Structure formats: C-alpha cells, structure tokens
Amino acid sequence: MVDVDSFVEDARAEISEALGDETAIIALSGGVDSSTAAALAYEAVGDQLVPVYVDTGLMRKGETDEIREVFDYMDSLRVVDASDRFFDELAGVTDPEEKRHAIGEQFIREFETVAEEVDATQLVQGTIYPDRIESEGTIKSHHNVGGLPERVGFEGIVEPMRDLYKDEVREVARHLGLEEIISERMPFPGPGLAVRVIGEVTPEKVAVCREATHIVEDELEAYEPWQAFAAVLGRATGVKGDNRVHGHVVAVRSVESRDGMTARAQELEWETLQRLQSRIAGTIDEVSRVVYDVTHKPPATIEYE
C-alpha cells in the first residue's frame, strides 16, 4: 500500500515541476481517478490548472450536476456539453476498439478547443497502473492512454497516479478530503456508457443503459460490490401487456475485486435478482429481458468492451 502522505507530497512536486508557469487542462470525468488527479493538481498549481469536464452524453445519471456541485471550489472549472458531437462520431461504429479510439480522439479535440481558449500547453490525466497494464498488454485500449490521436496538440502529458492501483487512489482521495460521492464511487470506464452498449451507440440505447445502471447501483449498494452496472447486449423477444415486443436485453454485472486486475462475480440472493429484473424490465419500456453475468475475470474482463 502506498504511503499517502509521501505520495501526495511527491505528486504535488512532480506536477509543479512539470507545469512550471504554464497553464494546463485536466480531463475531469467524474470518476475517482480523474477527480483525485484534478484535486492533486489543483492543490499544486491552483487556477493555473483548468479542469475540463466534458459531458459526452455517455455519463451516469445525474453525474454532470454532481460534478458542478463537488468541484465548484475550482474557479477555473469548465463544463462542456459535447454530447451531440460524441454521438455523431459514434454513429455507425460497432467495433469496440474503434469506439474507444473515436471517443479518445473526440475527448482530445474538446480539450484542445479549451486549451486554445486558455492558452494551455499541458494535459494532466488520471491514468492508473491497471490502465497501463491492459493497454500495454493489448487486452484493450483505454481512452486516456491507447485512444489518443497520433498527434496531440499539447507539449506534455502529466500522469501523477500512473503507478497507483484503484484502492490506493481511494486512499489518496480520502486524504485530500474529496466527498464520499467521489472517493467511494465505483469505477467507471473513461469512454462511459459506450462500452456498456454492444454494437452501435445511440442516444436511445445509452438512455436505457443509464437508467438500468442507476437501478443496479441502488439495489446492490448493500452488497458493497467493487463494481456493479448494467449493459445493453442486443434485442430479444418479450411480452408486455398483450403485445409481443422486440426489446433490449440488459445484463447485470456485479463483481468483487481489490484492484480490477482480477475479479469474481458476486453471488446475489435470488430475491435480489428478481427485484432487479422486475425494476429494470418493469420501469424501462424498451427492455424485454434481464440476465445476470456470473463470469469471473479472467476469463472475462469486467466491462463488456
């Protein structure tokens, strides 16, 4: 386990030295990784850092409002509504790697736009060790490492948490006084709900995934999962009222893990599973079927794409 006091001191020094007198922007996604990196960097250089929260349209329910509230102490915070642009980039894209690259490139384009406005030359990211391992091992690319465009319009990229695991990041977040809604938040992929929608990503599918994930997080909170969410897999025939429907299949995934490198599917009570399917299929009109994923990691990854 990392020595938090020493890490925070060293990270602040690293950030200050790397940035000098230059202005930087940081990718603030709302997850614990980027939020902790933003808090670290803001403590190091203040408003010299411009935190950029991009609403991609692929975020969790209520996430944008939460970010505005939690980080309102950062006077330099920028919130960018880019949802239409992200959906335009994802139109017709079905390959998981192409999705990640499209999202990563659009992220950087959004940051470059803000960087030009504030004359920023540096980019700070919340990359952690498992991100780098999966990317270097070609298991999958991560939008903040493997999905960057070949040519990035910044002079440097600073990744102060590149050697930390998720539980260590949480320790740092608590040390920095971040609210529990951030420090204890379940992991959320950089590309957002796009990697929880199999096939083409559309606003309608994402809306289904967002609401289903909200239900899963609510129902499974007592189980204290390392990560729990819903994914939209495809379509299947169902019956609603007196009508046959061809609705979405939603998979529920809930796992236990220490650092995300390996994970075990949680054993949920039958009553809990039935309550999940009742709420998801009963309140989301577009859903016809709910399944529970019992696969560990390995052989599966935690996320679907």
UniProtKB/Swiss-Prot annotation:
Recite the UniProt keywords alphabetically. ATP-binding, GMP biosynthesis, Ligase, Nucleotide-binding, Purine biosynthesis
Query: GO CC annotations?
Result: cytosol
Q: Does the keyword ATP-binding apply?
A: yes
Q: Which GO terms describe its biological process?
A: GMP biosynthetic process
List, alphabetically, the Pfam families matched.
GMP_synt_C
Q: Which domain of life is it from?
A: Archaea
The answer to whether the entry has keyword Thylakoid is no
Q: Which InterPro entries match?
A: GMP_synth_C (IPR001674), GMP_synthase_B (IPR026598), GMPS_ATP_PPase_dom (IPR025777), Rossmann-like_a/b/a_fold (IPR014729)
List the residue ranges forming a coiled coil, or say none. none
Q: Which GO terms describe its molecular function?
A: ATP binding; GMP synthase activity
Which residue intervals define the domain GMPS ATP-PPase in the entry? Answer: 2-185
Q: Its biological function?
A: Catalyzes the synthesis of GMP from XMP.
The name this protein carries in UniProt is GMP synthase [glutamine-hydrolyzing] subunit B
Organism (species): Halobacterium salinarum (strain ATCC 700922 / JCM 11081 / NRC-1)
